[in-house]
């Protein structure tokens, strides 16, 4: 960021404020989703937890999509009110457009991860996120900025390059049902029946 123009830095400052509002709301949604799923896993009602998980992931994606569309609809007066004009306004608008697409997938990944953790699978999502960050995102962003001197908005978009790939992997893991790993007595009492039904080895 320190190597970007003043206009880009101004746009980032405004964008981070708006992003923070979105994250504040949907992190609460994600926490609620993890409680709703984790409670059922702990009680041994794994089928309910399984069905509830994918419904909550899609509900979150739908809500964040609606929120981003609303943000885009009012972006012009909003960005002007926050002091962006000219080039900084153009960059800020571009960032909102990119984020509106990326956020739907990103928040879906967030809910996936929190749901897996609440069901006893604390490692899968976290390992995936860290691996993609260091093996894909950082090399891409570094190369785009320092080697190819790409436009700022392209560099910004590359920050989300891992999200669609992780989403597909997260979806496959969710439907595999392998993330349901109870530790409570009630959960352990019914887990074998659930695994047999879903073909989990």
Predicted regions and their residues:
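Interfacial/gating helices of multi-pass transporter permease domains
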Residues: 1-20, 86-94, 121, 152, ...
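Short helix-kink/termination motifs in transmembrane helices of multi-pass secondary transporters
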Residues: 4, 73, 138-139
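Short alpha-helical transmembrane segments in multi-pass integral membrane proteins
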Residues: 37-102, 144-201
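Alpha-helical structural context
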Residues: 3-4, 81, 119, 147
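Short runs within selected transmembrane alpha-helices of multi-pass transporters and secretion channels
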Residues: 26-30, 99-118, 124-136, 140, ...
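Small-residue-rich hydrophobic transmembrane alpha-helices
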Residues: 9-75, 106-125
